[in-house]
Swiss-Prot record:
One of its GO terms (molecular function) is DNA binding. One of its GO terms (cellular component) is bacterial nucleoid. It comes from the Bacteria. This is Nucleoid-associated protein A1I_00660.
């Protein structure tokens, strides 16, 4: 039988580790690039875009559609890096916690 007090202590430890991981993620910046660096987006761990850099060579009317695509690719690149880092951080926060039989976490 699982010791309930021990389980609660583990849950509190896990909660603290997850909060620390979330704070670290919020303070991390991710850079997404597209078009060989012609478009660059810097996003926070919360998924907020902080900066968009566009090479001057793309600022032509005939390049509008390509520029729009590159911005989308750069943003998705930054978001993928953030999501991957978030998954790794949460996995680390949960490591070592023994859960009761049949109890599954949502991630």
């Amino acid at each position: 039988m699982v010791n309930f007090n021990q389980f609660l202590k583990q849950a509190q430890t896990m909660q603290k580790k997850m909060q620390e991981a979330q704070e670290q993620m919020a303070n991390t910046r991710y850079t997404g690039k597209a078009g060989g660096g012609l478009v660059e987006i810097i996003a926070t761990g919360k998924g907020e875009v902080e900066k968009v850099s566009i090479d001057a060579s793309l600022l032509k009317e005939e390049e509008k559609e390509m520029l729009e695509d590159l911005i989308k690719v750069a943003f998705n690149d930054a978001k993928q890096k953030c999501d991957s880092d978030s998954q790794n951080s949460m996995s680390g926060a949960l490591s070592g916690m023994s859960l009761p039989p049949g109890f599954k976490m949502p991630f």
